[in-house]
């Protein structure tokens, strides 16, 4: 007996109803995991310019490149925060209020990036001071995985303080 794709599709669709584990289909979607990963990668680039991408930026272009990346992150982060706000019960606000709140929270979060950089600098310094094998602070940023992990945790903590769930 040959199984057809339509039969397999029907079985998979049936599992959506019985098992769950799917995003909201008939309402506001939850934040997108892949979208959040992309935003996080770009935030790491903003926190550590030149360390999290292959692009070589000249010092004369850093302001423009940073502004472009910041604008891109802001738009995408606002979308994901809006989804998070819509998910948080009880939520009886209109779509316009949700978007406005998301925009404000996005700007508040992004305003914390300079302070996050200062804190992360102390993390890099501590790793460098505590590891006699480390040759430079740049080596710490490039090759020590905890820097990325602590950066993500510190960003998540800021989101938590702003009561932004699911990001």
Residue ranges and their predicted role:
Residues 1-166:
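Terminal amphipathic alpha-helical/low-complexity segments used for targeting or macromolecular assembly
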